[in-house]
Amino acid sequence: MHSNNKKYGLGSSGAVLVSIAKAILTFENISFDNETIFKLVTLYNLTNNISGSMGDVAASLNEGLTFYQKFNASKLNNIIESKDDIKEIINSPWDGLTIKPIYPKAKITIFARWTGEVVDTKEHVKLWKNNKENYSTEYTTFVSASNKLVEQLVAALESGDESLVLNTINKLRENLHYLESFSNIPMETAAMKNYIASYPAGKQSGSGSGDIVLAFNKSNDNFQLQLNLEQL
């Protein structure tokens, strides 16, 4: 979405590219699976210098929740440089890549709220790259903790442990604050902090400090999402 020459992102770019790729292959009667679509869109993004984790692409492949683990970027780059045929690149295994649906049993409601803030993921990525070499130890600590917490969150969602889900969300938020402490990448605005404080758990969405803030609470119903596009 655009307003006053400012771009507001809602993860829509990944969804649009996934839809276009599926539509073209369907029109051409070419069979495909979700991994093929993900790889095609990712290669397009990399070719056009579109930065990011590609998590929005993975999340757009299926309805519901998705577990996504990013591929090893340097190893993928080696594959791209060593192969001329795009089919060979797509058919090659991408080290580290995992995309699979999550089937939550936990009765949790996510309250997603639009902040009205503008955030540019590319600028955050650029800022991080400028600082990463100076904080390699801290970054390794952050990534290790994040991976463990995500695995714990998936297990809690699928086992139906609502309390552990909320506790893990808060730990993920704390870990993001740790990243903020040495990366100079702002994670939350004051309005986001106040919104999160009114719920048992919460965190920013995306690269931080903009677009969407997420709050979590136990629910009497099944796992669900409530999106509020009224400006925070």
Where are these regions (language model features)?
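C-terminal nucleotide
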Residues: M1-K6, F27-S31, K39-S51, V57-S207, ...
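DPxDG-like acidic metal-binding loop motif
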Residues: Y8-I30
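Gly/Ser/Thr-rich beta-alpha loop segments that engage phosphate groups in nucleotides
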Residues: G11, A15-V16, M54, G208-I212
